[in-house]
Amino acid sequence: MSPQTETKANVGFKAGVKEYKLTYYTPEYETKDTDILAAFRVTPQPGVPPEEAGAAVAAESSTGTWTTVWTDGLTSLDRYKGRCYHIEPVPGEETQFIAYVAYPLDLFEEGSVTNMFTSIVGNVFGFKALAALRLEDLRIPPAYTKTFQGPPHGIQVERDKLNKYGRPLLGCTIKPKLGLSAKNYGRAVYECLRGGLDFTKDDENVNSQPFMRWRDRFLFCAEAIYKSQAETGEIKGHYLNATAGTCEEMIKRAVFARELGVPIVMHDYLTGGFTANTSLAHYCRDNGLLLHIHRAMHAVIDRQKNHGMHFRVLAKALRLSGGDHVHAGTVVGKLEGDRESTLGFVDLLRDDYVEKDRSRGIFFTQDWVSLPGVLPVASGGIHVWHMPALTEIFGDDSVLQFGGGTLGHPWGNAPGAVANRVALEACVQARNEGRDLAIEGNTIIREACKWSPELAAACEVWKEIRFNFPTVDTLDTQE
């Protein structure tokens, strides 16, 4: 008998295909504190039992493949395999269920969101035995969290850098998002910052196009920042989008921003990729730059309820990879966002310890072990009438960003910024006096209009604007 044949015989190798559930469905398994836990919404093909589908997810996202291989005998599968340890039905959905999978920590490279996602949401999402698959939530264990730097600075450090406390921060995305020259772009930035905003922002697809190259934009925006700071006595910033075609070019743009002395840069973390994002976050921490994160492309991944990945997972991944701000929906604006679900992942972005709460879509208790928090950014179709609701929903540790709601003011950009600042200050003062923003919000705004003609004009323009469409990605009703 040859040595190779002898090895196969000794490990009891038997060629062929066997059911996944014989190896990867282990309902008796007790999860460990070091396991990464995942909750998948699974829709199996007709005829595929839930246990087999759940086990297939565990197998194909860890050590398994479609057939038995003799090299299984050269390692300890019990140590390295993913395990489907629990299955539960989805209320109101006969063909869907939640499969809970535990992954040993040794399966993942330290400090790499890229590697974690390559395994957990890799090829398994194209598996033919599944009609659809969605990753609803992840529990990141402290042992793995501690291998990440996380956000470059975090909420408290940002407030200290900006010297701004006790209220949400105010921003504005410059519009039109494409087509302005660098000088006209810088003019709009100056007018908004001079009017009372804390930040202005490059839109996600502003990189370095023929009509406005990145270096020119950076220079004119820096001039606008310094001029508005000198005139207002407040620290100002503009999210300079450093996203580029290569990591090297991205870092070059961040270096130039640092040389200009501006406080913050920006990255499109999903289109740019997690490897690029983590690299930029490390640079920002080392060089004192805040990092604003845009989530362009997220709805391709997270909007459909039965396939893809919920944004709460992308939010957790961003906190690991690094970012000081991230767009998180508005609940009340033009973009998708269920209220309870949004509040759930907002807490996961900001808080150090978040308890399991299925009523808000949180499947696992998450301990961030002092990883810095991320400011959620509310942006998309919001205006001054939304200010009470936004202040009540998101609280002080947030960024409220009005693009069209600033630049669409009938009197111009600076009056639009004034209107938003007055509305915010009125809401914060009313809240601090004990008034209920959810009930008295419109009254508070009308009262402020009496001493702010800019706010009164904005209220008149947008009094009829509504985005009353049902949310596609709603929470399941728990029995």
UniProtKB/Swiss-Prot annotation:
Domain of life where this protein originates: Eukaryota
Active site: K175 (proton acceptor), H294 (proton acceptor)
GO cellular component: chloroplast
Top-level EC class: lyase
Propeptide intervals in chain numbering: 1-2
Modified residues (Phosphothreonine): T330
Subunit annotation: Heterohexadecamer of 8 large chains and 8 small chains; disulfide-linked. The disulfide link is formed within the large subunit homodimers.
Protein name stated in the entry: Ribulose bisphosphate carboxylase large chain
